[in-house]
Amino acid sequence: MVMRNPSALLLEQFPWQETLQWQPTPQQQEQFQRFYGALLAANQGMNLTRITAVPDFWEKHLWDSLRGILPWLQPTGETLWGAKIQQVIDIGSGGGFPGVPVAIARPDWSVTLLEATQKKVKFLHSLGSAVGLANIYPEWGRAESHGRRYDLALIRAVGDVARCCAYGLPLLRSGGILVLYRGQWSDEDTQHLETLLPRYRSRRLDIQGFTTPLSHAQRHCVYLQRQG
């Protein structure tokens, strides 16, 4: 009898389809598992994440990362908001979130993993072979050094709303979309956001509030579009 890795079994049993209306293929499931193993191994020597238990890793890292691109996990999402997604950037990727799960889920996207800490960039480079990903491009540097060449920008846990807009919106081509991954979100946040958007020739597309599937924590994803 072949014994299976219990962590892999747990990952398979989480409610992907019920909560994302999307199910990873066996290859993607294996890539998530290899990413988990690589992250745990590297985490012993550097501070990549405090979230290591399997249920927490699935919900707070994998699920949360993919929830931000939920519109593009559906068959109808390819032309959503008039955006054809090919070039993606994860700003402040850290241990690879949300960029690596996104790259696994969407192998047809080219995902730049932008990180300001060289040690973390080295880890991100190692994931290409460790996880079997040919569509991730780790880069060391800051957002300000990148031009307007991206169709989709993702920014998670990087400062306040003003800083997120300043980092993300200038990187987008006309029609490109910025996804802000946020915890709590208030009417005051929306009002503040509306004062920021004109300077970037951008508009608010949607604000989606939801609860996480295991811990039932409140989360929001904010979708903004560059218009000029």
Swiss-Prot record:
Binding-site residues, S-adenosyl-L-methionine: 92, 97, 115-117, 143-144, 156
Keywords: Cytoplasm, Methyltransferase, rRNA processing, S-adenosyl-L-methionine, Transferase
Entry GO MF terms: rRNA (guanine-N7-)-methyltransferase activity
Domain of life of the organism encoding this protein: Bacteria
Coiled coil segments of this chain: none
EC code(s) of this entry: 2.1.1.-
PANTHER family documented for this protein: S-ADENOSYL-L-METHIONINE-DEPENDENT METHYLTRANSFERASES SUPERFAMILY PROTEIN
Protein name listed in UniProt: Ribosomal RNA small subunit methyltransferase G
Organism: Thermosynechococcus vestitus (strain NIES-2133 / IAM M-273 / BP-1)
Gene: rsmG
